[in-house]
Amino acid sequence: MVRSRRTQIMLAVGATFLVILPQLIYWKVVTGSFVYDVGSKWDFLLPHFRVLFGWEKGWFIYTPITLLFIAGLFFMRRMPWRKSVLVFTMLNIWIVIAWHDWRYGGSYSTRALVQSYPVLALPFAALIRRVSVTRWRWPFFVLCGYLLFVNLFQIKQYNNTTLHFNGMNRAYYQAVYLDADPTEEDLRLLREED
C-alpha cells in the first residue's frame, strides 16, 4: 500500500514540513538552534496526578464536564474507533501528567489537555447516545447543564481574577465555589498552603 501511494505520502510529508518550517525558523532566529529545549523534563515513573485532581489547576475540578468525557470511554463497545480512542486517551493523559512542570504556567485548568477534546468528543457522544434512550436522560442532561454552568462560571471567575492563575488551594476554592464576590476573609485563604 505504501508503494502504491508513494506520491501522496511524499506530498503529505512535504506539507507537514512546510507547516512546521515557520516554527523551526523562528527558533533558529531567536535561540540559534532549529530545535529549542525549554529545559523541563519528564517524570514518567512519578506522574503528577494533581494535573487531574489538584486544587491548583485540576482538570476535573476546573473543567468538570470532562468527567463525562472519561465516563464515555466505558460506553464505546462496538465502536470501530474504540481501541484508538482508548490508547490515545491513556497515552495522552500519561504524557501530560508526567511533565515535570505540571502546572503548565499561569493558565486556567489544564490547558495541555485541550488538544484532546476532539478525540474525547467521541466517547462523550457515545455516552450521550447510550443515556438518551434511558429513563436517566433528563437527570443526565441536567447534570451536563450543571457541569457546563460550573465550568463557564469558573472561567468568568478566572477572568475576574477570583481564581488565581497558579496559587489555588482547597480552602480558597471551597470558599469561592460559585461565588461571584469573594470576601477579604476568602482572599486570605488564598495565601494559605494546602
Task: Enumerate the predicted regions with their spans.
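Membrane-interface junctions at the ends of membrane-embedded or membrane-associated helices
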Residues: M1-Q8, I70, F74-W81, A121-L143
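Short helix-capping/hinge motifs at transmembrane helix termini and TM-loop junctions
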Residues: R3, V30-T31, R78, W99-H100
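Membrane-lumen/periplasm interface segments of specific transmembrane helices
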Residues: T7-G72, V85-V96, Y117, Y146-Q157, ...
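Aromatic (Trp/Tyr) and acidic
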Residues: E56, T63-P64, F74, L120-A121, ...
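Juxtamembrane/interfacial segments around transmembrane helices
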Residues: W59-A71, R135-R137, F165-A171, R188-D194
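Hydrophobic/aromatic-rich transmembrane helices and adjacent perimembrane loops
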Residues: Y62, T66-L67, G106-R129
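Interfacial helix-loop-helix junctions of multi-pass membrane proteins
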Residues: A98-Y108
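Membrane-embedded, lumen/periplasm-facing catalytic core of multi-pass transferases
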Residues: L143-D194
